[in-house]
Amino acid sequence: MNTDNLIAHARARFDHVAARRVLKEKYEAKMLFAHNGGMWRAGPELLVLLATVPPGDAVVLDLYETPVQVNPEQLRGMAMMRWQEQMNAWLVEHEQLNRQR
């Protein structure tokens, strides 16, 4: 391989890594949602926390460590829906990005 090919390959690799990082940031931002006066990030941590909270109203800390009274079942349903929607969309874009590579 000549140096021009190596440089082109390195740039393409760097562009792919940068595009993956941008894609991750995009979908991490889309995981945020508001509910009951609190700000939440849909993800495994929130889903596991809400699965362990007993049924009925509970006080849970939101993203900004503000105590918020919520219905855990309702918040868990919203978080799960947001998580699945965004993860599915992220997967589609990630596969498209890998095909372009």
Please identify what each model-predicted range represents.
Residues 1-101:
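A preference for well-ordered globular domain cores
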